[in-house]
Amino acid sequence: MERFIFAALLVVALSLSGTGADPQCLPGWSSSDGYCYKVFKEYKRWDDAEMFCRQEVEGGHLVSIHSKTEAKFLARLVFRKFILLNVWIGLSSPGKHGIWRWSDGSSFYYTSWAFGEPNNFLWNEYCVGLMSITGHRKWSDQNCRSKRYFICKAQPQGEGSTW
């Protein structure tokens, strides 16, 4: 009997490892390094996607990316959703002067621009998406009015939350 219980617990532990399962994240959200993430397969313009993330969960925003590890996690998360299109992230140039800012207000120090980016093609690209052609690992500035899938990021709400 003890062997059976041990085996059952081992199977559960192994099935949850690497999935990002976290009791403090909403169902359907994935956890990594203290944050909750979710890919939304809904077409929205950049500003509408940001507003959606803010309304979806307290403290939510389009995803900010601060390390290669986080970028790899997000690429895998998007890949699991079988998305073959570019995906919005929370980086934009609100003043349209090439000064990039994360929508959550966090510091902008890590970059992963694709070759030749940002290029402000046709002087109309002030929002940033993960490029599908790079396996969602590299960034491209894009027209903010384009409708794309997107990734939201939030901190876990903690014990006793309404999540």
UniProtKB/Swiss-Prot annotation:
Question: Which positions in this protein are listed as binding Ca(2+)?
Answer: E125, D141
InterPro entries registered for this protein in UniProt: C-type_lectin-like, C-type_lectin-like/link_sf, C-type_lectin/snaclec_domain, C-type_lectin_CS, CTDL_fold
Where expressed (tissues)?
Answer: Expressed by the venom gland.
Q: Which Gene3D superfamilies match?
A: Mannose-Binding Protein A, subunit A
Q: Which GO terms describe its molecular function?
A: carbohydrate binding; metal ion binding
Give the main location: secreted
Q: What does this protein do?
A: Mannose-binding lectin which recognizes specific carbohydrate structures and agglutinates a variety of animal cells by binding to cell-surface glycoproteins and glycolipids. May be a calcium-dependent lectin.
- State what protein this is by name: C-type lectin lectoxin-Lio1
Organism expressing this protein natively:
Erythrolamprus poecilogyrus
